[in-house]
Curated annotation (Swiss-Prot):
<keyword id="KW-0694">RNA-binding</keyword>
<keyword id="KW-0963">Cytoplasm</keyword>
<dbReference type="GO" id="GO:0005682">
    <property type="term" value="C:U5 snRNP"/>
</dbReference>
<dbReference type="InterPro" id="IPR001163">
    <property type="entry name" value="Sm_dom_euk/arc"/>
</dbReference>
<protein>
    <recommendedName>
        <fullName>Probable small nuclear ribonucleoprotein E</fullName>
    </recommendedName>
</protein>
<keyword id="KW-0747">Spliceosome</keyword>
<dbReference type="GO" id="GO:0043186">
    <property type="term" value="C:P granule"/>
</dbReference>
<keyword id="KW-0539">Nucleus</keyword>
<dbReference type="GO" id="GO:0005829">
    <property type="term" value="C:cytosol"/>
</dbReference>
<dbReference type="InterPro" id="IPR010920">
    <property type="entry name" value="LSM_dom_sf"/>
</dbReference>
<keyword id="KW-0507">mRNA processing</keyword>
<dbReference type="GO" id="GO:0034715">
    <property type="term" value="C:pICln-Sm protein complex"/>
</dbReference>
<keyword id="KW-0508">mRNA splicing</keyword>
<dbReference type="GO" id="GO:0000387">
    <property type="term" value="P:spliceosomal snRNP assembly"/>
</dbReference>
<dbReference type="GO" id="GO:0071011">
    <property type="term" value="C:precatalytic spliceosome"/>
</dbReference>
<dbReference type="GO" id="GO:0005685">
    <property type="term" value="C:U1 snRNP"/>
</dbReference>
<dbReference type="InterPro" id="IPR027078">
    <property type="entry name" value="snRNP-E"/>
</dbReference>
Length: 90
């Protein structure tokens, strides 16, 4: 039996953000020092400081599950804790 070596490739953060942008994936952003609110929308641009232009942005209150549509915004990178693909709405 031959031994195959599986090589794992590290994914750079900028590449993952770019993939979200290219595929128009709806993402959720966790805010720094604000656990009660999150932002959901589509990344349409970003820079080397992780400043993000967000389209169709919604503010989600995690306590009440209420949503507030805020449209297109520029979110400064210092405010971002985590970016991930948003759960599909039923």
């Amino acid at each position: 039996m031959s031994q195959r070596k599986i090589q794992k490739v590290m994914v750079q953060p900028v590449n993952l953000i770019f993939r979200y942008l290219q595929n128009r994936t709806r993402v959720q952003i966790w805010l720094y020092e604000d656990v009660t609110h999150r932002l959901e929308g589509y990344i349409i641009g970003f820079d080397e400081f992780m400043n993000v232009v967000f389209d169709e942005a919604e503010e989600v209150n995690m306590k009440t599950k209420g949503r507030n549509k805020i449209g297109r915004i520029l979110l400064k990178g210092d405010n971002i804790t985590l970016i991930h693909a948003a759960a599909q709405e039923a």
